[in-house]
Swiss-Prot record:
Protein name: Uncharacterized protein MG371 homolog
Coiled coil start-end: none
GO molecular function: nucleic acid binding
Similarity section: Belongs to the mgp1/MG371 family.
Length: 325
């Protein structure tokens, strides 16, 4: 069993006993890890603190991925509830990326995150990049506090882990990841349901995947990139725009890959960067983004900034190529 900071455990345990209301937060454009962590914690509260109330903020508005697995809220949560709540923020590296921003209304805030620390914005924080996923952190947290995992918690945690580790294939996967996964499997949760929720996509989304792959350009230095036109996703019947960076995974000779699309809700360009072994979060940070060593994201005001980012990364790869030649 790993050891979590006893100061964090002690303080969080006291807050769980003190507060009756819990507002749970994820990052903008939430993925299965963010939701997996938040809904696993909500399920934990429902079992061990049944008289307390908890809601995952902003989940009532989610249109796409996750609705077949997570019990999204039916309606927005009233500010009066939030003002009397303990806000717990999951999988979010900086304050401006907290979905709804309602955490600022809460009485106190807690943050649980596995991204490299770039800022502090909660009263109590547990930040540890050694974990493969925020959901993995929640699983260990529940166990470390002396509670058991049930099948519902396990399903949500497993969804988060397989998403952020790319089915246990990424370098972020550790022995502790497999150790927790073994405990999750012991609960007997329905793995097929989780796999279907995470991986099954409509035919039109597969066609969109192919479109992105065909749209991509690959430089001689090993950079693959795709800049998607505004509204492209609509012609494929996709409910909301997606980064689709995974369309460029596993191309031989490609060392770094990135995509960028226009988000009509926030009127900005959103992009993702991935690599297998080259640290790329520093590139995202140059443009106000951030993330993990090999997986990062950014938000831009102008698509020309994306092409500048492409130029910077390609120059970096060219220099690496020269050094290694």
């Amino acid at each position: 069993m790993i050891n979590i900071d006893p100061h964090f455990i002690h303080n969080l345990t006291n807050k769980l006993k003190t507060f009756d209301n819990f507002s749970l937060y994820v990052h903008v454009n939430p993925d299965f890890d963010a939701f997996g962590a938040a809904f696993a914690f909500k399920a934990f509260l429902a079992v061990y603190f049944p008289h307390k109330k908890a809601y995952v903020m902003g989940s009532h508005n989610i249109k796409a991925d996750g609705k077949d697995l997570f019990p999204f809220e039916a309606a927005p949560i009233d500010d009066a509830f939030v003002k009397n709540s303990l806000a717990i923020i999951f999988d979010t590296s900086n304050q401006e990326r907290v979905l709804t921003q309602k955490h600022k209304l809460a009485k106190e805030t807690v943050r649980i995150d596995h991204h490299p620390k770039t800022e502090s914005f909660a009263d109590l924080e547990w930040i540890d990049p050694a974990f493969s996923a925020a959901a993995e952190m929640v699983g260990y947290l529940i166990l470390q506090m002396g509670y058991e995992l049930n099948a519902e918690m396990a399903a949500y945690i497993y969804a988060g882990i397989i998403t952020d580790t790319q089915r246990f294939s990424s370098s972020a996967t550790t022995p502790q990841t497999f150790a927790l996964t073994a405990k999750l499997l012991e609960t007997g949760f329905n793995r097929n349901k989780v796999h279907d929720a995470v991986y099954l996509k409509p035919l039109l989304e597969h066609k969109y995947f192919s479109y992105v792959l065909n749209k991509a350009k690959i430089t001689p230095n090993g950079l693959a990139y795709a800049l998607l036109k505004k509204g492209t996703y609509k012609q494929f019947g996709v409910v909301s725009p997606l980064p689709m960076v995974h369309a460029l995974n596993n191309i031989k000779g490609v060392k770094i890959w990135t995509t960028c699309y226009f988000n009509e809700d926030i009127k900005k360009w959103i992009g993702s960067i991935r690599s297998r072994s080259i640290p790329i979060n520093n590139f995202a940070q140059m443009f106000g983004g951030g993330g993990h060593k090999y997986a990062a994201a950014f938000v831009l005001d102008d698509k020309r900034q994306f092409m500048k980012l492409v130029e910077i990364m390609d120059d970096f790869l060219a220099k690496q190529k020269h050094v290694n030649s």
